[in-house]
Each structure stands twice: as C-alpha cells, then as structure tokens.
Amino acid sequence: MSGRNRIHRDIRDSYHDHRDLPPERPFLRGPPLLQPPPPSLLEDLQIQEGEIRRQDAEIRRLLSDNHGLADDRMVLERELVAAKEELHRMNLMISDLRAEQDLQLREFSEKRHKLEGDVRAMESYKKEASQLRGEVQKLDEIKRELSGNVQLLRKDLAKLQSDNKQIPGMRAEVKDLQKELMHARDAIEYEKKEKFELMEQRQTMEKNMVSMAREVEKLRAELATVDSRPWGFGGSYGMNYNNMDGTFRGSYGENDTYLGSSERSQYYSHGSGSQKKPRLDRH
C-alpha cells in the first residue's frame, strides 16, 4: 500500500509540475476565447502527452508489479505463517531437545562423577593391590620357610618316632638302672654301717693294742728282773734247757704250745677286735 501511495503521489506531482509549461494566464469568467495555440505549445503538449503515455505505461507496469508484489506478499505472508508455525514447532522441538540434552548432560555428569569415583576407587584398589602383592610375596617367603621347617619337623618326627620305638627298651634300662641305683644305695648304706663298725673295731683294737703294749712293757720289765736272777732248770716259765729264744707257754690254756717273739707279735696284732664280720649279700 505504501508503494501505491508513493506511485500516485509521483503521478500527482508530475501533473502539477509546470516548469516546462508557459505561465498561466489569469482565469477569466465567461466563455473561453478561441485562439490558436502557438506551435511551441503544441510541441510541449505533444511532449507532455508522450510523457503521460510513458508515465501511464510505467504506472500500469508498476501496478502490475504491485499486484505481483501483493501476490508475492500474500505468498510470503503464508510462508511466514508457515515458517512461524515451523519455527514454533522447531522451538518446541528445540526445547524438547534442550530438555533431552540437559537430561543427557545430567546423566553424563552423573556418569562422569561416578567414573571419577570409580577411578579414585580404582587408584585405592591399585594401592591395596600393590600392598596385597607385597604381602603375598612375604607370605610366599614365609610359606617357603614354613615348608623348610615342615620338612625339618618331619625329619625330627621320623627320628622321634624311631626313638619312641626305643622307649620301651629305654624304660626297661631305666628300671634296671633304678634297681641298680637302689642296690648301690643299699650297698653304700651297708658300707657306711660297716665302715662305722670298722671304725669302732679299730678304736677298740687301738685301745687293746695300747693295753697290750703296756702289758708287754710290764713283761719286759719282769723279764729284765728275771734275767738278772740265776736260771733254773724248768723254771716257772717253762724255758727249755737248750732253747735260748726265751719262749713262753701259750696262754688261754693251750697245751704244749710255745710262742716265740714273732708269733707273739702276730698274735697281738690279730686281736679279737681285728676279726672281720662276714658281709651280707647285697640286695
């Protein structure tokens, strides 16, 4: 419509443009005067008519163009409405896509956070796995050591089992040794008692020897006094006539027994206390 107004305004301006025309005469009332137009005016009129025709053709062309533009405008308006509808539909689709994209982004972010947590957990698992590998190696070393110890223990067990088979014999030997020990203890006790008795016998023998030595001294003194006297035949001590040894008749009522000096010493050395008691059999 603005194009149409612009075209009519141009036409109106072209009709009112009198720059090429002669100046108008004052308008007179009454019938017009018939005067022949000058030739220049005719030429101008012809020119103006040609210009009018040209402008009319231009106007028609512009009108046809305006109709075409109006049709194009209607088509464009229809297309604009369709485009607006399509745009609205596209906006709805875009909003749906954005919502879906936001949902996917949230899911992706959640998955990313979950994966990051899994990665951190995997790092901790890796550390734990390395620690467990070290512990497994240590346990393998301990296992090897224990296997060696088990072999040694098995050898010791076999040895102990073989030794256990010898235990009954060893027990019998221990019992025999205990019996021998008891016999030895009894023998030691008997030896102690016997030694004590021997000590008592020795003391009594020493006392007897001292008393006998005194008697011998007395006898020697008596002999000395007897030697100073004259010898008689068949004296009181029964000395033989041809025996110069000075033997005496045996004591304790022995008949026809005479003891010399050596026999007397043996007799006094083997007193009654020197006789040993018979030993008892060991249990």
UniProtKB/Swiss-Prot annotation:
UniProt-annotated stretches for the region Disordered: 1-37, 252-283
Family: Belongs to the FLX family.
Assembly and oligomerization: Interacts with FRI.
Key words, A-Z: Coiled coil, Developmental protein, Differentiation, Flowering
Matching InterPro entries: FLX/FLX-like
Gene expressing this chain: FLXL3
GO CC annotation, single: nucleus
Effect of inactivating the gene: No suppression of FRI activity.
Protein known as: Protein FLX-like 3
Presence of keyword Coiled coil: yes
Biased composition (Basic and acidic residues): 8-27
